[in-house]
Amino acid sequence: MLDWVGGALGFAYVPPSPYGIFMRPAYFGLTGGNYGQNRTLVHEAGHYCGLFHTFQSTSSCGTETNCNAQGDRVCDTPPTTGNFGCPSNGGACDNDLVNNYMDYTYDTCMDSFTQGQTLRMLSSLETSRPGVVTP
């Protein structure tokens, strides 16, 4: 039996933790609502492939001194405090990527990973989850 933490819609283990993505059935598939367009599954797959939230370990806007060790640890995603809903003003920080799958915006707003996130996922799959991708 899975014991859900708080109001989580799903969760995934990041490498090198045990494999797995878990989803609440109500948020799997095209179920309607703010989080019912399968973007939660894409978000959790991002975690499974080594990504963190765009707002990971960040409590303010600004510049990271070491983008490989701070925030989401991907240099082409700017620091953010995290977004909810579909912010029409571009988010809490001036350069927020409110459309990023690794934020908490509504599914209708999410539509992309950055190039750096894509490279991190590919690297993670090759090194930490080699059985998932075959040449």
Label the predicted regions.
Residues 1-42, 48-135:
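Extracellular (secreted or membrane-anchored) zinc-dependent metallopeptidases
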